[in-house]
């Protein structure tokens, strides 16, 4: 059966839900698809479908990143429901890196919690350009003054992390009330908060300027073998465009030279695409490449446009204890994990002459040597993590090798 073709009629924007565990991110994601489905602009995706890995449902926390698709009158959206639990922040880093804008979900009765702060900080580090807030579970609070206090606290938190806290839209509502409503009338009062939220997302999150004219690059998130067709790699196109017949290179995560291959097909949401462009989440079919020859963390790129490097200089901000960082300094030879695009790689740190240690809160230029070369270039941002928490954020200032 021929696949349906994906029609590009509206601007495409990548958004995602972030926030503390159990504040309602997954419920809200399901509620958005439900309400927009009433307008024929989405397929309803249930809470259980989003939260669908067996080890998750027992604890009711989301681990995997789930993509859903929906439309408003203005735009086509791909929405990721990001993991909320601190243990799964690793996915948050790779997930938040995919957002043109975030929906921060905060439970009104609880207010901002540690993971709320950590996610806002991460959103800042991975440069999520804009954020709107959904103040959830407001039906459990009847005190208007308390609600206003929670809003004030949220605006202050956002401002402290470099977001324009005074102007960010905060939409109040109940995701559960919308999700559990039996009404098929789009004008039912319990659906209004979802419509208001989508309106805020439409208006406040800017349509991203896509880097379409630059050389093609796509960080690889996943690899699948498809019987009789070959190997498919999936990811979000960072820049440029790709179509059937293009020659591409698989770069990084190896000490060997990049492998060349030819694209034999491009798909988005199970529909074939004439060409994938920057910002699209796509699957790319590769000719003559075995499933074992490609892995998450590599990039697919226009030949010669990016090279793998293991040594680079970087400007790094080391988080303070209050920001969830280290409590103690670190020294030359420190070996944390570097989160670069879709991968984490161990690297050793050298400090500038005369610098003997780095304190939490310092901003420092350091030399990093990764244990395996990765596709990097000047200006690339990354996070530094150890023991399950972010300890620094950095940007590549110069390639050394």
UniProtKB/Swiss-Prot annotation:
Residues noted as binding GTP in the record, renumbered to the chain: 19-26, 81-85, 136-139
Enzyme class: hydrolase
Region feature G5, mapped onto this chain: 174-176
InterPro entries assigned to the protein according to its UniProt record, in alphabetical order: EF-Tu_GTP-bd, EF-Tu_GTPase, EFTu-like_2, EFTU_2, G_TR_CS, P-loop_NTPase, Small_GTP-bd, T_Tr_GTP-bd_dom
Pfam families in the record: GTP_EFTU, GTP_EFTU_D2, GTP_EFTU_D3
Region (G4): 136-139
NCBIfam families cross-referenced by the UniProt entry: EF-Tu, PRK00049.1, PRK12735.1, PRK12736.1, small_GTP
Family: Belongs to the TRAFAC class translation factor GTPase superfamily. Classic translation factor GTPase family. EF-Tu/EF-1A subfamily.
Protein name: Elongation factor Tu 2
Source species: Roseiflexus castenholzii (strain DSM 13941 / HLO8)
Lineage: Bacteria, Bacillati, Chloroflexota, Chloroflexia, Chloroflexales
Gene of this entry: tuf2
């Amino acid at each position: 059966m021929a696949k349906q073709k994906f029609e590009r009629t509206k601007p495409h924007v990548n958004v995602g839900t972030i926030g503390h565990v159990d504040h309602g991110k997954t419920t809200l994601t399901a509620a958005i698809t439900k309400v927009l489905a009433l307008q024929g602009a989405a397929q309803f995706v249930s809470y259980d479908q989003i939260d669908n890995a067996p080890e998750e449902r027992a604890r009711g926390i989301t681990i995997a990143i789930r993509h859903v698709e929906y439309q408003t009158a203005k735009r086509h959206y791909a929405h990721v429901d990001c993991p909320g639990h601190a243990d799964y922040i690793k996915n948050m880093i790779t997930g938040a890196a995919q957002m043109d804008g975030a929906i921060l979900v905060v439970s009104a009765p609880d207010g901002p919690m540690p993971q709320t702060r950590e996610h806002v900080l991460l959103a800042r580090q991975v440069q999520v350009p804009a954020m709107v807030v959904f103040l959830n579970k407001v039906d459990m609070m009847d005190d208007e003054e308390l609600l206003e206090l929670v809003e004030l606290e949220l605006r202050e938190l956002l401002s402290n992390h470099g977001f324009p806290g005074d102007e960010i839209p905060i939409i109040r509502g109940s995701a559960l009330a919308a999700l559990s409503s039996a009404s098929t009338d789009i004008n039912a009062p319990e659906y209004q908060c979802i419509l208001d939220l989508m309106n805020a997302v439409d208006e406040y999150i800017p349509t991203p300027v896509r880097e379409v004219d630059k050389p093609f690059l796509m960080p690889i998130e996943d690899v699948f073998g498809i019987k009789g067709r070959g190997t498919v790699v999936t990811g979000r196109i960072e820049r440029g465009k790709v179509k059937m017949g293009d020659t591409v290179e698989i770069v990084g995560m190896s000490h060997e030279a990049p492998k060349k291959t030819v694209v034999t097909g491009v798909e988005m949401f199970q529909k074939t695409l004439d060409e994938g462009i920057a910002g699209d989440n796509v699957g790319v079919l590769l000719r003559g490449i075995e499933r074992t020859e490609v892995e998450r963390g590599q990039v697919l790129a226009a030949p010669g446009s990016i090279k793998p490097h293991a040594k680079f200089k970087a400007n790094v901000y080391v988080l303070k204890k209050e920001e969830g960082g280290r409590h103690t300094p670190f020294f030359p030879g420190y070996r944390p994990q570097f989160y670069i695009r879709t991968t984490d790689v161990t690297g050793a740190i050298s400090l500038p002459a005369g610098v003997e240690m780095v304190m939490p809160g310092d901003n420092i230029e350091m030399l990093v040597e990764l244990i395996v070369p990765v596709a990097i270039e000047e200006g690339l941002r990354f996070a530094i993590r150890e023991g399950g928490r972010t300890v620094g954020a950095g940007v590549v200032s110069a390639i050394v090798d």
